[in-house]
Amino acid sequence: MVGIDVPEPKSKCSDPNCPFHGDLPLRGQILEGTVVSDKAERTVTVERSFYKFIRKYERYEKRKSKIKAHKPDCIDVRVGDTVKIAECRPLSKTKNFVVVEVKGEE
């Protein structure tokens, strides 16, 4: 229904920015990360770790990026959960992603 292969949440919501029960189209990247903050209303902060090669030292360094994502009412997410987020139209100044699946706790 959403255009990607994820199970639909069991609970219903009336959020217009929900890709399952609202009318929010998804396009672009689909990423995975760990939730590090859920303090903002209907927003979670997802952290992704990756390695970057430093040519001068011929070594890798660990880097991380934090992405703000919209959390629909029908998806229950807590800090420490591994989630799948999908790119959508800009929902605010910093939110361009929405949570589509909870993989579980890390």
From Swiss-Prot:
A Pfam family assignment: Ribosomal_S17
InterPro entries: NA-bd_OB-fold (IPR012340), Ribosomal_uS17 (IPR000266), Ribosomal_uS17_arc/euk (IPR028333), Ribosomal_uS17_archaeal (IPR019978), Ribosomal_uS17_CS (IPR019979)
UniProt entry tagged with the keyword Ribonucleoprotein: yes
Biological processes, Gene Ontology terms: translation
Disulfide bonds: none
Keyword annotations of the record: Ribonucleoprotein, Ribosomal protein, RNA-binding, rRNA-binding
Keyword Nucleotide-binding: no
Gene Ontology MF terms in the entry: rRNA binding; structural constituent of ribosome
A single GO cellular-component term on record: cytosolic small ribosomal subunit
Function: One of the primary rRNA binding proteins, it binds specifically to the 5'-end of 16S ribosomal RNA.
Assembly and binders: Part of the 30S ribosomal subunit.
PANTHER family: 40S RIBOSOMAL PROTEIN S11 FAMILY MEMBER, 40S RIBOSOMAL PROTEIN S11-RELATED
Record-stated family: Belongs to the universal ribosomal protein uS17 family.
UniProt name for this protein: Small ribosomal subunit protein uS17
Organism: Methanothermobacter thermautotrophicus (strain ATCC 29096 / DSM 1053 / JCM 10044 / NBRC 100330 / Delta H)
Lineage: Archaea, Methanobacteriati, Methanobacteriota, Methanomada group, Methanobacteria
Gene that specifies this protein: rps17
